[in-house]
Swiss-Prot record:
Domain of life: Eukaryota
SUPFAM superfamilies the record matches: Thioredoxin-like
Biased composition (Polar residues): 33-45, 70-84
Span list, region Disordered: 30-88, 217-239
Cited InterPro entries: Glutaredoxin, GRXCR1, Thioredoxin-like_sf
Name of the protein described by the UniProt record: Glutaredoxin domain-containing cysteine-rich protein CG31559
Family from the record: Belongs to the GRXCR1 family.
UniProt cross-references to CDD domains, sorted A to Z: GRX_GRX_like
Ranges for domain Glutaredoxin: 295-400
BP GO terms, sorted: sensory perception of sound
Origin species: Drosophila melanogaster (Fruit fly)
Matches recorded under PANTHER family: GLUTAREDOXIN DOMAIN-CONTAINING CYSTEINE-RICH PROTEIN 1 (PTHR46990:SF1)
Comp. bias intervals (Basic and acidic residues): 217-227
Record field: compositional bias (Low complexity): 58-69
Amino acid sequence: MVLATPPVSKGGNAGGLFMDQYQQYAAHCETADSGNGSDLESTGLPTKPDDSEESGPSSLGSDSMHGSSTEYVRQSASQPSGQRQRQKSLRVLGALLPDSLLRDIRDRRSTEYVVQFSQPEDEEKIQVPDKIPEKPSPFRLARESLSEDKIEELRAAVERANFVQTGEETLDSIDATSQSLPASSNIGGHRGNINYKYADDQYYSFHINEHENFGARSARSGDEADHSTGAGSEAGSDSGILTEQQDLFAGYRDVRCGASSTQSTIRSAKGTVRGVKNRVRNGIATFLQLQQQPNAKNFKEKDLGKVVLYTTSMGIIRETYTKCANVKQILRTLLVKFEERDVFMSVEYQAEMRQRMQSGQVRVPQLYVEGQHIGDAETVERMNESGELRQLLKPYKSMASTYTCQTCGGYRLLPCPSCNGSKKSVHRNHFTAEFVALKCMNCDEVGLVKCHNC
């Protein structure tokens, strides 16, 4: 809207001229402040420079005061104060901010739309905007905080790079320290290579002997399989089992639980040892052994590390003889090295069976492991079918059980070398009758002794 400048009359009084100019300027100010100029600016059409500015000097020639005020009003109407401040701030930021950040700011400015409240409702219905505002896309919304995201990403990348660098330096220092330390500092020779779930677990050393015994047991079983043909290796394996049991448990171990069950530990979520399995069962076995007769402990120490089978070689009762043969065949099939004690050939074994069974009758066969009673022929056959007997006798497996003694032929008994089985005393002669009742004291009642190789 262009306001024409009224011509200034040369004639007339000065008061009328002043009033005419005042009314024109007042109308012009009301038009500028009414909001119509903002409505014109809201349209997408480019604004042209106002022609009233060119005619300004002609109308301002009469009064300099009114001319300066009119020029200020026209400039304020053509260019809002907020836009001037924004342009000034952009010029200042343009000298400080990078080009990429300025480009993001311009993109955000393109999505801003000024809502016009002074436009009438009828004009809003008729007027169609040249450019329909689009909904801001998620990419546009994400770009509003692009500068902050870039700063955070750069900072995180720097932190990760520093962490990786320091971690590599720490690992290099740890490797150098571990190589400089002697090998004896690592417990069991493999503790330095353990990857702990928690850093504090490296300072815990609970039940270290159990892991060492487990490795020693596997190594000992391999050595026993290779070098158990001689008597020296047998004594070494027996002493190894004895030492292992003393380290694991102070009392008597229940052999029915198996040898591997004594080494299984109860661990928490952090990996710390909270207990050992079957300790209560072993304690009960110890209590029951102590409650038996006083000579029971002697049998326990006598049969420590051995598998003892009481049998008979008398074939009059075929059922008993067959049961004894079946049990011996099962033990040989499992490659178990056992000691056979024939109650028919030795009265001493008969008395020993009566003491162990706490009965006047002797029933064979009977199997004992580590001095603990396992059962008769039916129990052994049932355990063999279920596979429990194999696990029970696994520590006593030996290749020496397949070989037959060349001295006694597998009977474990030999004639007495002193009396040659006659039971005659060496002090007896054929010329006097005083020493007829003398008998050999080096052998049993039938003139037999135990095989020195078996």
